[in-house]
Swiss-Prot record:
This is NAD(P)H-quinone oxidoreductase subunit N. Signal peptide: none annotated. The keyword NAD applies. InterPro entries: NAD(P)H-quinone_OxRdtase_su_N (IPR020874). Its EC number is 7.1.1.-. One of its GO terms (molecular function) is oxidoreductase activity, acting on NAD(P)H, quinone or similar compound as acceptor. Belongs to the complex I NdhN subunit family. NDH-1 can be composed of about 15 different subunits; different subcomplexes with different compositions have been identified which probably have different functions. The gene is ndhN. Its main location: membrane. PANTHER family: NAD(P)H-QUINONE OXIDOREDUCTASE SUBUNIT N, CHLOROPLASTIC. HAMAP family: NDH1_NDH1N. It is a peripheral membrane protein. Pfam families: NdhN. It comes from Crocosphaera subtropica (strain ATCC 51142 / BH68).
Length: 158
């Protein structure tokens, strides 16, 4: 029964592999339960969508530049023709700096992970080896029941 699951197997699998691929029922609700179980086990959770990530490594761990939409306004003779660049701090590295000392680490829960390329998924597999306090959960699709598998096993199959 879904209501009686404790999530211990999920947490153990995440701690062992560092990056998991998840298939969840499309009606939703299961992700929140497992995120809550991660938080009760001492992890902080950050949910983000794979759409619009751009360069995953720069977005998560490096300072990167973004250009806001121009909204029809132009700066004639000032700056680049394509608009100004604003530099944004890395999302995951910034969250790691603000973790409490008793926290086990940060879990990046990435929604709509099926749009990520194989190279981006390989980077997400290597991220927990680069920074041991980061764990990664990528939602890769729908299933009739909530199931997970190490992300590197899923990449090897694809």
């Amino acid at each position: 029964m879904a209501l009686l699951t404790t999530g211990k197997g999920f947490v153990r699998a995440l701690e062992k592999s560092g990056a998991l691929g998840v298939y969840a029922p499309l009606e939703g609700g299961f992700e929140g339960r497992y995120q809550r179980r991660l938080r009760t086990n001492g992890y902080d959770s950050l949910s983000l969508t794979a759409r619009g990530l751009g360069d995953v490594s720069a977005y998560l761990m490096g300072v990167h530049g973004v250009r806001p939409p121009h909204l029809g306004k132009k700066n004639i003779g000032q700056g680049a023709a394509v608009g100004p660049i604003y530099f944004v701090p890395p999302i995951a590295a910034y969250q790691l700096e603000s973790l409490s000392p008793q926290s086990k680490g940060l879990v990046l829960w990435i929604l709509e992970g099926y749009i990520l390329s194989k190279a981006e998924l390989e980077y997400l597999v290597s991220l927990p080896q680069q920074e041991p306090r980061i764990k990664v959960v990528v939602e890769l699709g729908g299933e009739r029941y909530f199931r997970w598998e190490p992300l590197e096993n899923l990449i090897a199959v694809a």
